[in-house]
Regions:
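Residues in flexible loops and secondary-structure boundaries
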Residues: 15, 31-32, 92, 104
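Short beta-strand segments
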Residues: 19-22, 94
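A short, charged, amphipathic alpha-helix used as a generic interaction element across diverse proteins
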Residues: 12, 25-45
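Short aromatic-glycine-(Arg/Gly/Cys) micro-motifs in beta-strand/loop hairpins
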Residues: 1-20
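N-terminal cationic leader/targeting segments used for protein routing and processing
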Residues: 4, 30, 101-102
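Generic detection of short hydrophobic beta-strand segments and adjacent strand-loop junctions
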Residues: 22-25, 102-104
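Short, mixed-charge low-complexity intrinsically disordered segments
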Residues: 39-104
Length: 104
């Protein structure tokens, strides 16, 4: 069976929301997109996340919750995710993930 790797960006703020799906034939390409999306979110011109203060890779604001899972090694095809939520406004979040799917 063949595999495909779906990179999902799901975001929501008070101003709007959207979901973007991108399908890749290799895990390496999907993982590169996953990391690029996270980097893009850290840019204040692109996302609410970019306006946050960070300390040691974690949001400094206690009302912001970050949960993530990265792949463990270069040969692992982990279904990674990066979820950041404003716990005082659950409508404000960014969720980025890689999903591995088998296709017939």
């Amino acid at each position: 069976m063949e595999k495909v790797y779906i990179v999902k960006l799901d975001w929501s703020t008070e101003d709007g929301n959207d979901t973007e799906l991108t399908v890749y034939g290799t895990y390496d390409k999907a993982y590169a997109k996953f990391k690029n999306l996270i980097a893009d979110e850290m840019n204040p011109e692109n996302s609410w996340v970019g306006n946050l203060e960070w300390k040691d890779g974690i949001p400094a604001d206690d009302k912001i919750e970050l949960d993530f899972l990265d792949h463990r090694n270069d040969t692992d095809e982990t279904e990674c995710y990066w979820l950041i939520t404003d716990t005082w406004n659950f409508g404000t979040h960014t969720y980025i993930s890689i999903e591995n799917k088998e296709v017939l």
